[in-house]
Amino acid sequence: KNVEGNLVNYENLDNLQMRIHDYFKFLKYGYDRITDWCCWHIRRGRMNREESIKIAKEKGGKYPSTYLKVSLEKILNEINCSEEKFLEICKKFTNPQIFRCDNQGQPIFDKNKNLEKINYDNISEK
């Protein structure tokens, strides 16, 4: 089974905060470890761009509610942060040029606290 937020089962296992780090990378820049792995597979000829976009859309950027079977609440407790505060920080650093936002410019989270990118292939819509 793959590690949450990754395509493999052996990467980023050194501490539980790695998943939070990868999630903030997604919020700020629109890509995460899954995208990194897809790019590596494309460069090695193991996957094409269309497959990569599909995988990144399905598996990438998911809210880090658990990591390695540990709840986000427990991970955040270790750094003295509540999930409410974590969500505030997420909203503050979410790039509105990459993710769908409401009329006030606030990111729109679904019922699972996931965001929707405006464009998954990072090519401007015509």
Q: For the regions a protein language model found, what residue spans apply to each?
A:
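Nucleotide-activated chemistry modules centered on ATP-dependent adenylation/adenylyltransferase
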Residues: 1-126
